[in-house]
Amino acid sequence: MRVLGIETSCDETGVAIYDSEAGLLGHTLYSQVAVHAEYGGVVPELASRDHVRKLLPLVDGLLDNTDSRNKIDAIAYTSGPGLIGALLVGACFGRGLAMAWGCPAIGVHHMEGHLLAPMLEDAPPAFPFVALLVSGGHTQLVEVQGIGKYVLLGESLDDAAGEAFDKAAKMMDLDYPGGPNIAKLATKGDVSRFKFPRPMTDRPGLDFSFSGLKTFTLNTVAKYADETGLPDDQTCADIACAFQEAVVDTLVIKCRRALQQTKLNTLVIAGGVSANVRLRERLEAALAKINSQVYYARPEFCTDNGAMIAYAGCQRLLAGQVEPLAINVSPRWALDTLPAI
């Protein structure tokens, strides 16, 4: 089965073609970073309009590059969670193509796509495992027994980790997107200068909270600010380093706790923040001490992309899942409500 995957949940337009026998044939990604940079964050209306402009030429080029014209068996598109306007662009486009081509179409859960992205690698993880889904909109620990067999172990009670990264970056006047810029600045910082809190690590449970850490960062920036309203460059780097270390520490502690609680020895990290080099280093070191392994997708598949949607959709279609013709999108959609296959 050859599946065209379409991702438009936020500010990236991703398309890909996955073949159940040959694997990933090709993928293309257009990022809207330049569109939203001047606003310091994603503007939903601009995101939707840009998806409309980019989808057709991206799909057209991909069909040619992969020799897939008239060879697509099904279409998978992100149907939630995400920005409703952006989701509708991809859903309408995908459903329209499916009707024109006379093939089935299926809506895919965005976070299931992220969770399954490491399956695209040469050495994928095997079920069961614990997944850390960590992005701008989600921070969740999930026990995964198979596709659709998900048990939520813990989640953020307020800000997601990626959202906290972006907000901390804004406090230091760093460009959008903030997460990668915080990580870059942190490499120049002194990790021993500031000690930031590790929220909710001193109590049982697997939930997260990053709002207090965000406030602590804001107060530290204000305390050391000069006449420009910001601390000097080195202090900003030290704050970025301390902030990143606090987030990474918190995630590592909770991941170890989740593995011990479930008695599993495999961890998958997925979502945009999983591309963070420091997080990967710390998790690999921590899990090696307890004879556990960590898996993640290549960096280009950590952020939103069409490949993960094509793969996830293909697995559900092969299992016989079918959907009505109605176009349904869900801006909010709990992962553990998905049907098992």
From Swiss-Prot:
CDD domains: ASKHA_NBD_TsaD_bac (cd24133). It is found in: Cytoplasm. Its EC number is 2.3.1.234. Keywords: Acyltransferase, Cytoplasm, Iron, Metal-binding, Transferase, tRNA processing. One of its GO terms (cellular component) is cytoplasm. It catalyses: L-threonylcarbamoyladenylate + adenosine(37) in tRNA = N(6)-L-threonylcarbamoyladenosine(37) in tRNA + AMP + H(+). This is tRNA N6-adenosine threonylcarbamoyltransferase. It comes from Saccharophagus degradans (strain 2-40 / ATCC 43961 / DSM 17024). The lineage of its organism: Bacteria, Pseudomonadati, Pseudomonadota, Gammaproteobacteria, Cellvibrionales. The gene is tsaD.
